Amino acid sequence: MAMENPFEGKEIWFGVGSQDLYGEEALRQVAQQTGEMVDFLNATGKIPAKIVLKPTLKSSDGVKAFMTEASANPNVIGVITWCHTFSPAKMWIRGLEVLTKPLLQLATQHHKEIPWETIDMDFMNLNQAAHGDREFGYIVSRLGIPRKIVVGHYTDPEVAEKVGTWARACAGWDASQNMKVMRWGDNMRNVAVTEGDKTEAERVFGASINTWAVNDLVAAYEKVKDSQVKDLIEDYKAKYDVAPELLDSRYDELFIAAKEEAAMVNMMRENGCTAGVDNFEDLGTLPQLPGVGPQRFPSEYGWGFSAEGDWKTSVLVRIGAVMGYGLEGGASLMEDYSYNFVPGNEFDMGSHMLEVSPSIGTIAKPKLAIYPLGIGGKSDPVRLVFSGKPADAVVVSMADERERFRLLMDEVTIVEPQGSLKNLPCARAVWKPKPDLKTAVQCWITAGGSHHTCMTTSVGREAWEDFARIAGVELAVIDENTNARQFEKELELSEMYHRLNNRH
């Protein structure tokens, strides 16, 4: 089993701006040199989607046709623009106003160094990106169109890295726009932060969030073929340290867990869904609260999953899985559980009953085991038990703030647990939040962040910032420079801005 490549067949179109004023020879050089730049960027291996150079943009009609075609093509996930020469910005207005794909403005040039001894006006006319980029930048800012700006010579490794990160955010946005979320049951009773406006979420993020009866899952469970279950069990044996009793005296419970995974996967595929969520309060006649299956949603299928009806976190996990495709690490549901308040040795420990995914990386081979679980009122569930591997990571939550959604992110460092945790029968991760535990927790609570988060170890802050900019959604960030008093003031300004400037 492997996640489908979200970049397969996807393209980023590159539009270079100029004008007929410069003549055929100059325009020929514009196209040739831009082609060299695009070829170089594609060859770096840092940009997961193919960049495709389109004919030079020289007129308002040409720009509008380019933007219209890019917006209508489902394989195009983003547009890069660059002005090799001066390109009058009025000719960009009609095109920019019809663009619906993410935009990146590349401020670069073909030559790396000014040719001090040979530079003349012919060279200046051809190579005036510093001139053209400012003209283009003005009109984009005037129109209020969000875009990522990358500055530097195209051979600078940082340029390709930033373009690549943005391309990942574009893929996350494309996945969000085409996402179907399968809810088995409703929200956990009386819980506030996991609630949210599903209609507004579809308008803002594109994700279609709907409910299927748990009885539908039970019916799918009854239809699963034994051969599919046995194939899953063989996969478990190949990837995990399976507790001996699951292959002997408690094999029936292992079979049930695998059968539940198969049923969930079959329903997801039949309905074209890429994120799912269940609720331990609504299990119908399912034998177990699903454990190992949901844990494998991100790691084996690239799907989002969350618990207790929290579809918002499931959406984030799917987006995180797509953005991080092909990189080390992954995305998972995480929940803050317990603090270590020892001075100088302060940590946050996250976990969940069953659903934390090994996609984030594990210290040792995950153990597939069975333990009692009082919640849910079903038979003992089978689950993966492990500790998250040390890594840089971020935790991201989504909250419904009545008139808008807010994303909240904290940069963290996952560390090894300082003990065996031998009596803790669930997957977990221990981390140091930035800038420190007390400040991070205070700021998180001030911003109304959820106890459920999406933890990503594959992509970090920049990818989520790019995604939030594309979506036009508020993102509050807690990092090493955060000061609680200043954070509260910035949050007030952010609330005011996003209420007044809701471009949706």
Curated annotation (Swiss-Prot):
GO cellular component: cytosol
A molecular function (GO) term: manganese ion binding
Entries under SUPFAM superfamilies matching the protein: FucI/AraA C-terminal domain-like (SSF50443), FucI/AraA N-terminal and middle domains (SSF53743)
Family affiliation: Belongs to the arabinose isomerase family.
Binding site for Mn(2+): E308, E335, H352, H452
Keyword DNA damage in annotation: no
EC number: 5.3.1.4
Keyword Isomerase: yes
Keywords in alphabetical order: Arabinose catabolism, Carbohydrate metabolism, Isomerase, Manganese, Metal-binding
Pathway where it operates: Carbohydrate degradation; L-arabinose degradation via L-ribulose; D-xylulose 5-phosphate from L-arabinose (bacterial route): step 1/3
Gene3D superfamilies from the UniProt entry: 3.40.50.10940
Reaction equations catalysed: beta-L-arabinopyranose = L-ribulose
Cofactors that this protein relies on: Mn(2+)
Protein name: L-arabinose isomerase
One annotated GO biological process: L-arabinose catabolic process to xylulose 5-phosphate
Pfam families: AraA_central, AraA_N, Arabinose_Iso_C
Cofactor notes: Binds 1 Mn(2+) ion per subunit.
Top class in the EC scheme: isomerase
